[in-house]
């Protein structure tokens, strides 16, 4: 699925905030500064140079700022230790049992002192960025995660900046529902990848009916389809109850569809996700 490359460069970004997925940056920088010390016998110790790890993170953040001009304000987003998706599907990201690299938490704590940082309990950084971007439009999401293609607006993936329309974002959500995400631990429809999902939707239209039919054709159920759709969904401002401080689980109407030139319509516990 193609997304339009942004041509609104430098001057057009004046006054925008850069919403940065900092989980990725901190993990990468801390891992790169780890050192293994072998004392022989059964003792091997992994150490890290905190100062170098922190400087590495700052260098990465400065690179991003320079990409858009130093006038850009940055906000760093991190994932909460709790995750609402585990209540939907306990095995969600269950295979990610590798410990964080040395210094990971300490670097984050230092960043909280030096930068504006946002973490929402129960949410991943992706969700918090999605909520912020759809509440305060006109900013740039900075993330290599393909999930962020669901969120309308500008997305910089560390290679290029693309403009994502509401329709394109809604279509990508349905594609991910069918194709699943092995990295996150939900399978979608067996044997259906992104290319095949696009082919199915090109023939049947981007509808909830097409999603359900594809799941049923493989011996699965509509409940399976809804579970995958909720796991795949990156939250927007309309998917979050700010008073209760909890997600509003995505619930499509039977005739949900995404039409070019119109907004997708869904019913989410009585709230429209337009």
Q: Model regions: which residues?
A:
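Extended two-metal-dependent nuclease catalytic cores across DNA- and RNA-processing enzymes
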Residues: 9-13, 43-45, 71, 94-266, ...
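Positively charged N-terminal leader segments that act as targeting/secretion signals
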Residues: 5-7
